[in-house]
Amino acid sequence: MLAALLYGKENLRLETVPDPTPRKGEVVIQVGAATTCGTDLKVWRRGGHAKMLKPPTLFGHEAAGQIVAIGEGVTDWQIGDRVVANNSAPCMNCFFCQRQEYSLCPNLTWNNGTFAEYLKIPAPIVKYNLLPIPEDLPDELAAMTEPLACVLHGTARSNVKHGDKVVVLGDGAIGLMFVAKLAHDLEVEVLLFGGNDDRLEIGKKLGAAQTFNYRQLPDIPTVIKEYTDSWGADVVIEATGLPSVWETAIACARPGATVNLFGGCPRDTTITVNTEQLHYSELTLKGVFHNTPEFVRAALSLIASRRIPFELLISEQRPLQDLETVFCDMRSRKVIKVAMIP
């Protein structure tokens, strides 16, 4: 089969590799659509990921498709079933899993390789995080289940209350998903900050009450205070993964606010925090990572409901052979998400 392999920093190659064969408890799907992700872009640019993968490796982690092979012991699925698989599954046995803190599981089973014609799903993911796709839901929408599950997890951990003013920093796919979830389901006022006018316009379509191009602003915290009676935002969600923006997020918060530091920064980076602000303003700073089986199911259900036009996030469909060009387009912010069709 044709598959993308990551060998290092911006070193992505399409190669012919053996078709996968399922072992006990596993299934193999024919990929119908694999969507690109901001995490993929960061991994491509950085040459690896602290938890998910180490080069050389098959690449990509969002996909939907159809089961074409079933391993020994698999009884809940049949060849021909349309499915979407999360890119991980918890062990269900460790200290954290016993406390239902599944995203902290040190034994997470990770799966990469969606940018390929076929994808093998490991047995733990088949058991805990493989879901049937509703008949009328296109593969490219179902493939966005994993990132939306992360966003639903992040939203649930952000202490959002009715009527809050919520600031989202970042107009990538994750930031826009946060806007959509917050605006449609939580009755809050969302202020979106980003650097691309086209993406900010999509943010408005997804429910942002106000959008701001940070390139045209002297100072983001000052603008936020103008919209919040000089206090700052009730909740701030950072969705860029840049240490400087983590610091900006904290500066945007009112006393008593929650700051969700959602975007993963490069390894071994640090930030500076004003201890006086943190202590006397009683700020809550949260790092939120990945998703859980509960949110994977909730994400697919939300996408399938079609209440929110998540298709706005898919800029185009492209053949797998164009993958490197697509990543260059993502780097220059010409596209948000692209559905790769093997």
Give the role of each language-model region:
Residues Y7, P18-D19, K54-G60, N107-G113, ...:
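Short Gly/Pro-enriched turn/cap motifs at secondary-structure boundaries
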Residues P18-A34, G48-F95, L131-D136:
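Glycine-rich beta-strand-centered segment in the early N-terminal region that forms part
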Residues R82, L137-L217, T222:
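Mid-domain Rossmann-like dinucleotide-binding core that forms the NAD(H)/NADP(H) cofactor-binding site
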Residues C91-L169:
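NAD(P)H dinucleotide-binding glycine-rich loop of Rossmann-like/cofactor-binding domains
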Residues S158-V160, H184, E201, K205-T284:
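Glycine-rich cofactor phosphate-binding loops and adjacent beta1-alpha1 units
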Residues N196, C265, N291:
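Residues in the short beta-alpha loop(s) of Rossmann-like NAD(P)-binding domains
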Residues P218, E247-A251, T292-P342:
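C-terminal hydrophobic helical "lid"/dimerization subdomain
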